UniProtKB/Swiss-Prot annotation:
Residue span(s) of domain UBC core: 74-222
CDD domains: UEV_AKTIP
Organism phylogeny: Eukaryota, Metazoa, Chordata, Craniata, Vertebrata
Topology versus the membrane: Peripheral membrane protein
GO cellular component: a single term: plasma membrane
UniProt keyword annotation of Protein transport present: yes
Protein name as annotated: AKT-interacting protein
Amino acid sequence: MNPFWSMSTSSVRKRSEGEEKTLTGDVKTSPPRTAPKKQLPSIPKNALPITKPTSPAPAAQSTNGTHASYGPFYLEYSLLAEFTLVVKQKLPGVYVQPSYRSALMWFGVIFIRHGLYQDGVFKFTVYIPDNYPDGDCPRLVFDIPVFHPLVDPTSGELDVKRAFAKWRRNHNHIWQVLMYARRVFYKIDTASPLNPEAAVLYEKDIQLFKSKVVDSVKVCTARLFDQPKIEDPYAISFSPWNPSVHDEAREKMLTQKKPEEQHNKSVHVAGLSWVKPGSVQPFSKEEKTVAT
């Protein structure tokens, strides 16, 4: 007999006997086993303690409501859009140029062609808040204080808040401030003036007011060639007429043809014309009769 099978049969017999004892209630309990004590591995000497990762701090927000990470780009885009609007408006007699050092500062000049301030050339600077367009309205300060009811006689600042008490984004624009600065020289307003003397003279003694306006225009014209108050490569400056420089530039401006006119002349229109040259009446050409 195979010893393996003999061992298996004996073990079966022993197992059956143990089961019978269990059924009869004679149960022997085995002593509890003592589990070995668990120990953590030792920590290396140069190891850093493991700390819980901190949650990322919320992105800081700038005063204009945009995230600080892209706030400067948003401001730059807004100012670029504003300057594009100024160019498209083509404000008569008003020229502006953003500063080289800061997009929040624009240099400008206003030419007055008729009215009480005729022949006036007034240079100014526009200061834009750093939280534009959610802050206050831009400030406009003339380089030389102009004698005007709405211009501070000391600082030269124009009362812009009169027209823009609360600056509304997407509704108010910088070109409107420039248009307002031009309009105040053609339509005089004396209510709540920054220069009370100018307001009183305009209401009580218009001749004396005109005399002081003429003097103010002469002062601005005499100091037109002064160096800009703010040192900046893009600051607007004037120089006396130089024929070797300005004659050529003037000739180019006067002889420059519009692109539309050049395009119309280059396009050849084929077909018959029934309009006599120099006439706008159709069928004005005289028909030539052939003698038979």
